[in-house]
Each structure stands twice: as C-alpha cells, then as structure tokens.
Amino acid sequence: MAKTLYEKLFDAHVVYEAENETPLLYIDRHLVHEVTSPQAFDGLRAHGRPVRQPGKTFATMDHNVSTQTKDINACGEMARIQMQELIKNCKEFGVELYDLNHPYQGIVHVMGPEQGVTLPGMTIVCGDSHTATHGAFGALAFGIGTSEVEHVLATQTLKQGRAKTMKIEVQGKAAPGITAKDIVLAIIGKTGSAGGTGHVVEFCGEAIRDLSMEGRMTLCNMAIEMGAKAGLVAPDETTFNYVKGRLHAPKGKDFDDAIAYWKTLQTDEGATFDTVVTLQAEEISPQVTWGTNPGQVISVNDNIPDPASFADPVERASAEKALAYMGLKPGIPLTEVAIDKVFIGSCTNSRIEDLRAAAEIAKGRKVAPGVQALVVPGSGPVKAQAEAEGLDKIFIEAGFEWRLPGCSMCLAMNNDRLNPGERCASTSNRNFEGRQGRGGRTHLVSPAMAAAAAVTGHFADIRNIK
C-alpha cells in the first residue's frame, strides 16, 4: 500500500500496538531545556528511575537566559532556579548539557540540527511547541508536555495516536527576496491558525525544494502556528549535504548506509492525503501580520483590513478585537505603521542565513531614531560564524544591539520584552496578546523585513530598498 512520508515515519517507530489502544512509539532523540524539565526529573527521582537512554537525550539552556551576560542570576530568581535545576539534573542523570558557558549553547531547535543530533527518519520530541522545526529533515518531531517528558526520559517511548495527513504544495518559484518566512506566513494566512489542527503537514513543491535547510526549518517551525501536530519536508541532497560531517551525524560507510535509507523517506506515488492545499509561489509577496494570531497576515503593500470585510462572524469579531489590541485603524497602509522595537532572533529566524539577510539591509544604514533593535543569534556557533563574517560589526555600526544566544524577546520569560503599547517587528513565530510582554504589540516578519523596519522606523517593502 502506498504510504505518505508521515505514515512511513510513524509505522517505523511503533513498538507496540494493541487493538483499540493508542500505539506506543520509540523516540530516537529527546531534547531538553530548563523550563519544562525540572518536574520531569523530579518524577524520576521520586520513583527511583534512571534516564533510560541518556545518550539519546540532549539538554541546553535557552528560554530564561540573559542575552547580555552569562550570569545565571541575571533574569531573576525563577530563571536561576530552573537553570540550576537543569545543571543538577543533567549531572545526576548523565545527560549531556550545553550550559551557559558551553560553546554549543543556544536555542534548542537551533542547537539540535547544527550538532547533527537531528537526522532524517528520526522521531524527535522536546517539551516545547516548536519542536516541529526538526521536521525539515524528514524527521517526525513534535512538542510534548512535562508529564510526557518524564515518560520519555524513563522509557524512551511515548503513546501517540495517528494524525490526519495534509499536503501543502507551493508550486513554481518564489520571487527574489521572498523567504521561507514569507511563504509560511502566506500558507497560514490561507489555512488560518487552526487549519492544520489534527494533521501532520508535508510541505512540497518546487518552491519548497528550492529552500535551504535553514529555510525549511523556518517553514516547519511554524507548522504548529496553523494548528498542525508537526511539519515535514522529505529529505534530499540538500538535507544530506547539510548533515554530512556534523558532530553527531554518521561517518564513513555508516553515513552512506544512512543515505540509502533516507532516500526511501519520500511519499509514495499514489499515496493519499486527507487534505491538500495549493499555493502559487509567484503570488507571494513580503508578509507582515497585523493581528494577534499568525493567520491575520497581509502583504506589506496592503492596507489594514476592515473587520466588516470578513464574512465569517467569528473572524469578524476576532479582527475587531485584534485591531483594538494592536491599536490599528482599518484602511491605513501597513507601510505607515511606525514601530518601537525590532527583534531579529528566535528558533524561527536566528540562523546564519537569517542574520546575513538582515545584515544586507542594515549595511551602511542606521537604526531609525527612537527604535531599539536587537539581533540575537540562535547559538554559540551561529554567533561565532556571524562574527567571523563581520556581521556583528555591520549591525553594531548601524545601531543594532548584538546579543548573546537565547530565546530572548520571542517570549516574555527573560529580560528582553516589550513594554505595554510598544510595537515590535519580530522574526519570531507568535503574535498572541502579551507574548513579548504584557500589552506588547507583535508583528511577525522575515529577517530582512525586520531590518528594513529598523532602519526606516516603519514597515517597508524590502523590494524598494536599494
């Protein structure tokens, strides 16, 4: 029987499946951070259980860390306790930890791929909703809760029901300057923020194949923002070339054998999906969210929509509420909306290609008066590479703040946050009310678009910036 990529990955990991019971899946990789793991380790300790496979468990610090100092005390008492607990737990249970002073420390979904922890064909979990990022490699990756974190630590397995399947095909080639962030925001704009609920999404089509691995990670990172369980891109030569030579990747003949298997990780011809969505890449322009969920998104050249234009009463009410929170009036051009802060970073857009794209816009320009702009590399290796390329100097000369790795202003769990009423052009993944700080107003954009907003003081079409 013809199978989708998701069905192949799922079936290959079923340990046990009884009639009328949820299947038990084997988990190949477990990524751990300081926020969702303390209670899970406490549970192991209370029952006298070890970590079943510490060699398949990798930990780092990211959510609570300061991006201005490596001082564990910098972000308050709760952050300090969570980080100290992670240090203690990893030492006690034999788990590898990339702590604040480790050169590989960074956002968990940046660290995993760049160290070769993430490989095609794997099941990967983490107590974090954006674990879908790793699906870019053709791995089945999804976020789990703290009780499930404990279960995986103890057993290296997890009960999981089968999801529905969705194919999202982006046909043709994207225009120059259109990034994976624009593509995924356009997709969510079409499906809505709940359009993928109950599904695992496979992204395909020429525009997806053209993306680098970093672009594919951006794409899969935001699958959760359309309600999907996970996002997938089938592995190909782009994937294999990215993985080759990385720290935890197979070497020599093992790598060749792995590629032979990875090449089978494609949806079979004739396999059927429960839902199919199609977009034309050439129609996608630079995207900016205007509301309080990622599906409330328009082209940078559009006007703020009028709630009255929504036929669905629920969407209309949602738009009215969003505009009130965001302090926006219907009908005004998006390019006239001024911003207070810019955040370039997060597990969505903090990799080297993202920083290069932002630096290209920033080079030779200055951050607009009254705007604070942060650039937060996703990991120690990303920061080191950016500095080797001189990107830090470009940003600093333009008036951006060059920070240490961490989740930073993506979420208000550390010192980087918005004040009430402040408006931010952000390369992160969520624009919910209060996500970046109580009363903060978040607009999701690509790194180049964020840099353009920083130097102009308002949203601007990067295609017009020469």
Curated annotation (Swiss-Prot):
GO terms for biological process: L-leucine biosynthetic process. It catalyses: (2R,3S)-3-isopropylmalate = (2S)-2-isopropylmalate. Coiled coil: none annotated. Its cofactor is [4Fe-4S] cluster. [4Fe-4S] cluster binds at C347, C407, C410. GO terms for molecular function: 3-isopropylmalate dehydratase activity; 4 iron, 4 sulfur cluster binding; metal ion binding. Pfam families: Aconitase (PF00330). Binds 1 [4Fe-4S] cluster per subunit. Keywords: 4Fe-4S, Amino-acid biosynthesis, Branched-chain amino acid biosynthesis, Iron, Iron-sulfur, Leucine biosynthesis, Lyase, Metal-binding. Its EC number is 4.2.1.33. Pathway: Amino-acid biosynthesis; L-leucine biosynthesis; L-leucine from 3-methyl-2-oxobutanoate: step 2/4. InterPro entries: 3-IsopropMal_deHydase_lsu (IPR004430), Acnase/IPM_dHydase_lsu_aba_1/3 (IPR015931), Acoase/IPM_deHydtase_lsu_aba (IPR001030), Aconitase_4Fe-4S_BS (IPR018136), Aconitase_4Fe-4S_dom (IPR036008), IPM_dehydratase_rel_enz (IPR050067), IPMI_cat (IPR033941). Disulfide bonds: none annotated. Catalyzes the isomerization between 2-isopropylmalate and 3-isopropylmalate, via the formation of 2-isopropylmaleate. Belongs to the aconitase/IPM isomerase family. LeuC type 1 subfamily. Heterodimer of LeuC and LeuD. HAMAP family: LeuC_type1. This is 3-isopropylmalate dehydratase large subunit. It comes from Escherichia coli O9:H4 (strain HS).
